[in-house]
């Protein structure tokens, strides 16, 4: 891996791999593509973290929970989005406002200050209490910012009308963009339409192959 602001030669590079794993309805193709990426990176010397909907579920299926010696994978939960399309947009807009404040050239804001942002106040009822949602946003952002690279595993997730798949990945790309973490995407199926959201997503990618 090339040197960047997040990497150092004194330790293994930390790579976050994002795939559709941890679903209680097992998706064999998505799981296989994600693990293929993770294994290739681990064999190359990377310290791999898998983003999942359920850490215990993934560790059980993959038989690769992180051990005391540092082997295996670490896990990071997805930031979950509401079902309604308008509410998903409100949530992503609030996340971007939080990121803007976190990366501003001034003292780091408190949770209370972030909760007071108009875009956060506009979040739907399903994401209340707002303090807990903002804490999850900040923890999510800090975890991704600590990575040296992010890899979004291939499949049809960016071509999906299931809102959680696209918006979960858009949120990862947004955090990586603000934190300056290189973002790579393995082969993806793409929709015919090109929305502003997807154009923003692809502009953040360092290497966007398609299938």
Regions found by a protein language model. Give the residues of each.
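A conserved, positively charged/aromatic
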Residues: 199-210
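Aromatic- and Gly/Pro-rich donor/ligand-binding loops
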Residues: 3-194
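Short intrinsically disordered, low-complexity coil segments enriched in acidic
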Residues: 1-2, 211
């Amino acid at each position: 891996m090339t040197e960047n602001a997040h990497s150092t030669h004194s330790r293994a590079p930390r790579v976050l791999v994002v795939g559709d794993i941890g679903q209680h309805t097992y998706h064999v193709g998505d799981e296989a593509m994600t693990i293929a990426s993770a294994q290739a990176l681990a064999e190359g010397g990377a310290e791999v973290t898998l983003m999942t909907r359920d850490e215990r579920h993934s560790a059980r299926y993959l038989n690769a929970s992180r051990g005391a010696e540092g082997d295996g994978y670490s896990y990071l939960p997805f930031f979950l989005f509401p079902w309604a399309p308008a509410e998903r947009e409100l949530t992503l807009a609030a996340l971007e406002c939080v990121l803007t404040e976190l990366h501003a050239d001034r003292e780091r804001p408190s949770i209370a200050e972030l909760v007071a942002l108009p875009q956060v106040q506009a979040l739907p009822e399903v994401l209340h209490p707002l303090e807990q949602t903002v804490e999850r946003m900040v923890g999510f952002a800090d975890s991704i910012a600590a990575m040296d690279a992010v890899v979004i595993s291939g499949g049809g997730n960016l071509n999906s009308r299931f809102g959680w798949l696209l918006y979960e990945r858009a949120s990862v790309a947004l955090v990586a963009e603000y934190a300056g973490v290189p973002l790579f995407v393995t082969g993806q199926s793409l929709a015919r339409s090109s929305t502003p959201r997807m154009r923003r997503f692809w502009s953040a990618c360092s290497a966007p192959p398609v299938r």
